[in-house]
UniProtKB/Swiss-Prot annotation:
Localization (cell): Virion membrane; Host membrane
Organism lineage: Viruses, Riboviria, Orthornavirae, Negarnaviricota, Haploviricotina
Membrane topology per record: Single-pass type I membrane protein
Virion surface side: 19-469
GO biological process: symbiont entry into host cell; virion attachment to host cell
Pfam families: Rhabdo_glycop_CD (PF24833), Rhabdo_glycop_FD (PF00974)
Keywords: Disulfide bond, Glycoprotein, Host membrane, Host-virus interaction, Lipoprotein, Membrane, Palmitate, Signal, Transmembrane, Transmembrane helix, Viral attachment to host cell, Viral envelope protein, Virion, Virus entry into host cell
Known partners and oligomeric status: Homotrimer. Interacts with host LDL at target cell surface.
TM regions (residue ranges): 470-490
S-S bridge residues: C42-C304, C77-C110, C86-C132, C171-C176, C195-C240, C235-C273
General function of this protein: Attaches the virus to host receptors, inducing clathrin-dependent endocytosis of the virion. In the endosome, the acidic pH induces conformational changes in the glycoprotein trimer, which trigger fusion between virus and endosomal membrane.
Record protein name field: Glycoprotein
Length: 529
């Protein structure tokens, strides 16, 4: 099935008076960090589109903006067993290899390493020196714990940490497991009272039919930071001693529920939330449920997972591939780019943004509202082949700026969007350090290294490299032959160099004995002669 006709329908953006509405980070620069292997986050799909002829009312309310910004400082604690293996063959050669093994750090390991990191005394000693024993395979081991800064997102309503690196996308403790079994995440500061945070004024647009009864099923809501959300599941809920609306995506906004929409109070339109209802702001917020939207979600998800498959296979990526990882709706999400051949990610808040077209000479647009004056959208660029790259495949060719996702949505693609560059993840958090301390002619690999003194494994090791084994056997045979010839040569020379007198004495003794023998046999005459 050809995906491009579908993409034209799926990715078409809203057009207002010749301008495109897209979603884009609300900051010009982000905090980037390398993507570790096993990360496969895919964003929520495009928002539902509602009838634009409906009446609209602007509701002014407040939403929490977090005790911290949209990201939180913290550290990833990596632990690994660094192994130097010496394979000392019985016939002489030594084979030295190095490997790094996954090892889950303990709380005490990370606390000690973090304190050393803050003191500036945390160092990487590298691989231990080899220890070799004849005809055996010997491992020298060293446990290394490293700490690296890592920002995560924050759920403003529950205080949970959110990041694709966490199993399930979130963590509520101060010692968080990650999808990488040799790494854990530790926050820089402890969580405080969630209600002590500040609340930001937000304008939420409520749309509804111009005629007919006002019931919750006929409402829809959206803002600069929120996708279009149906009102069927909206309910009234208290948060931090304030009344407000809990929306379909799980988020909440405080407002006066006694104000009216078309002479009907909000409290009379929407029901109270049932006991136990949770409000949340994660990377996986819920959305509307319709057949068309679900089909779109499946297509978006398959394109996103196809990009992650390429990342797992360490294939080069194009700007178009990166664009499939970007969110399609406003709100919290992840951004991706390529830095020095390595895939990086960052937490971002996506806001509705209006641009002139998918390809522009200046990277400017209106953030939040269509009527806002254009402003600079992005200023952080990284090398990508002959071009520069920003978030989610945004390409700077030197002459123009291209948004791949929105160009292909309009059926416009060119060779620039297919420019390839390396964008591999980090296989192991300590691999870059290993390469910096290991000679280039040595080998780094994962898995079990070294064997015990099992004789079967030992013999198998002898013939692991048949060319060297054959040469060694030939050398041993030649050594035996040369040794044998040397011994024979010494014996022959020894015989040749013995004095002649000894042989004469033997002959005289032999003649005398023969004469005595004849005399005893009765031949004296013969003896006298």
């Amino acid at each position: 099935m050809d995906l491009f006709p579908i993409l034209v329908v799926v990715l078409m953006t809203d057009t207002v008076l010749g301008k495109f509405q897209i979603v884009f980070p609300d900051q010009n620069e982000l905090e980037w960090r390398p993507v570790v292997g096993d990360s496969r986050h895919c964003p929520q799909s495009s928002e539902m589109q509602f009838d634009g002829s409906r009446s609209q009312t602007i509701l002014t309310g407040k939403a929490p903006v977090g005790i911290t910004p949209s990201k939180s400082d913290g550290f990833i604690c990596h632990a690994a067993k660094w192994v130097t293996t010496c394979d000392f063959r019985w016939y002489g050669p030594k084979y030295i290899t190095h490997s790094i093994h996954h090892l889950r750090p303990t709380t005490s390991d990370c606390e000690t390493a973090l304190q050393r990191y803050k003191d500036g005394s945390l160092i990487n000693l590298g691989f231990p020196p080899e220890s070799c024993g004849y005809a055996t395979v010997t491992d020298s081991e060293a446990m290394l714990v490293q700490v690296t800064p890592h920002h995560v997102g924050v759920d403003d309503y529950r205080g949970h940490w959110i990041d694709p690196l966490f199993p399930g996308g979130e963590c509520s403790t101060n010692f968080c497991d990650t999808v990488h079994n040799s790494s854990v995440w530790i926050p820089k500061s402890q969580k405080t009272d969630i209600c002590a945070q500040s609340f930001k004024n937000i304008k939420m647009t409520a749309s509804y039919p111009s005629e007919g009864a006002l019931v919750s099923d006929r409402f829809a809501f959206h803002s600069a930071y929120h996708p279009n959300m149906p009102g069927s599941t909206v309910c009234i809920m208290d948060f931090c001693e304030q009344k407000g609306l809990r929306f379909t995506n799980g988020e909440w906004m405080g407002l006066n529920v006694e104000q009216s929409i078309r002479e009907k109070k909000i409290s009379a339109i929407f029901p109270n939330c049932v006991a136990g209802t949770e409000i949340r702001a994660t990377l996986e917020s819920e959305g509307a449920r319709t057949l068309t939207w679900e089909t779109q979600r499946m297509l978006d998800y398959s394109l996103c997972q196809n990009t992650w498959d390429k990342v797992s296979r360490k294939e080069p990526l194009s700007p178009l591939d990166l664009s499939y990882l970007s969110p399609r709706a406003p709100g919290k999400g992840m951004a991706y780019t390529v830095i020095n051949g390595t895939l990086h990610s960052a937490h971002a808040k996506y806001i509705r943004t209006w641009i002139d077209y998918g390809e522009m000479k200046e990277i400017k647009g209106g953030r939040g509202e269509y009527s806002k004056a254009p402003e600079l959208l992005w200023s952080q660029w990284f090398d990508f082949g002959p071009f520069k790259i920003g978030p989610n495949g945004l390409l700077h060719t030197g002459k123009t700026f291209k948004f791949p996702l929105y160009l292909i949505g309009a059926g416009i693609i060119d060779e620039d969007l297919h420019e390839l560059d390396e964008a591999a993840p980090i296989d192991h958090p300590q691999m870059p350090d290993a390469k910096s301390v290991l000679p280039e002619d040595e080998e780094i690999f994962f898995g079990d290294t070294g064997v015990s003194k099992n004789p079967i494994e030992l013999i198998q090791g002898w013939f692991s490299n048949w060319r060297e084994s054959v040469m060694a056997i030939v050398g041993i045979v030649l050594l035996i032959v040369v040794t044998f010839l040397a011994i024979k040569t010494v014996r022959v020379l020894n015989c040749l160099w013995r004095p002649r007198k000894k042989r004469i004495v033997r002959q005289e003794v032999d003649v005398e004995s023969r004469l005595n023998h004849f005399e005893m046999r009765g031949f004296p005459e013969y003896v006298k002669r």
